[in-house]
Amino acid sequence: MARPTGKKFDKRRQQQNPLFKRKKFCRFTAAGVDQIDYKDTETLKDFIGENGKITPARLTGTKAHYQRQLDTAIKRARFLALLPYTDQHKA
């Protein structure tokens, strides 16, 4: 039996998936940020997972230009001990 592939099926499938609800957008583009500052640890913490890894752009919706800046800023903040390297080190 063939799978149904109509618009009605797609809408129903999207409504059932809880991860599909929120549209991804770049927070930095919306705010008009030019440079991401490594000293703004509250913003940087939003882009670090619970295990200490940097969250990829495909999950956060951050544009590539800002993702590179974000990566550098997080690494600088870690080096200066503003952010922890792992989840076991609480800052």
From Swiss-Prot:
Family matches, as InterPro entries? Ribosomal_bS18, Ribosomal_bS18_CS, Ribosomal_bS18_sf
Q: Which Pfam families match?
A: Ribosomal_S18 (PF01084)
Instruction: Tell me one GO biological process term.
Output: translation
Q: Which GO terms describe its molecular function?
A: small ribosomal subunit rRNA binding; structural constituent of ribosome
Q: Which UniProt keywords apply?
A: Ribonucleoprotein, Ribosomal protein, RNA-binding, rRNA-binding
What does the entry list under GO cellular component? cytosolic small ribosomal subunit
* HAMAP family, sorted: Ribosomal_bS18
Role according to the record: Binds as a heterodimer with protein bS6 to the central domain of the 16S rRNA, where it helps stabilize the platform of the 30S subunit.
Q: Which family does it belong to?
A: Belongs to the bacterial ribosomal protein bS18 family.
The subunit field of the Swiss-Prot or TrEMBL record says: Part of the 30S ribosomal subunit. Forms a tight heterodimer with protein bS6.
**Annotated protein name in UniProt:** Small ribosomal subunit protein bS18
Native organism is: Burkholderia vietnamiensis (strain G4 / LMG 22486) (Burkholderia cepacia (strain R1808))
